[in-house]
Amino acid sequence: QPNTPARQKTNDFFVLFKAAQELRPHFENEVLRYLATFESAAPRNTLKGASIKRLARSRQKTAMDYGGDAAMLKDLLRGSVICSDVDDFAKCFRGLAQLERDGVVSIVIVKNRVRDGALASGYIDANCIVKFRDYLVEVQLHLADIVAVKKEAHGAYEAGRELDLMGALAEPPEETPRSHLALNAARLVVLGMCLV
């Protein structure tokens, strides 16, 4: 069913939150630590390890993006691996494929912004939704240089997300003077937030 959106096995928010808490150490040990060392002489940074999305942000995302359907929340449990360069990034993808061959995860969705192009904000990374022990979790792969820039602008990103400006940063489907003006205004708001 290629057009069916990926969903958790339940839409009970509290069941999902409890499962994320129980799965967290296993996800850390079986997935993130494996990726941190796969084809690497020295372990890669995994930022803060496996983390659970904050309750308030999870509820907000469920309400704003998924019409209240918690089964659509695929990144409640997530973890990041920092790659030194594009070659290292490719190694992490090979590691994820190996985890799938070994039956540890099943890859469900891959958004590879290194290969496919940056977000409207200019950010590039890869977000992989995988099924791990019957739940959907997110593996984020980042490039070290991009993470350094992201740290500087994260406050502006969060403010833009809260104001629902991120979609406004994308190129308008049709070029009209008004759409171009709105696009530039949204970009200036985020730029201004970065400078504060």
Where are these regions (language model features)?
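Long beta-strand-rich cores associated with HINT superfamily self-processing modules
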Residues: 62-192
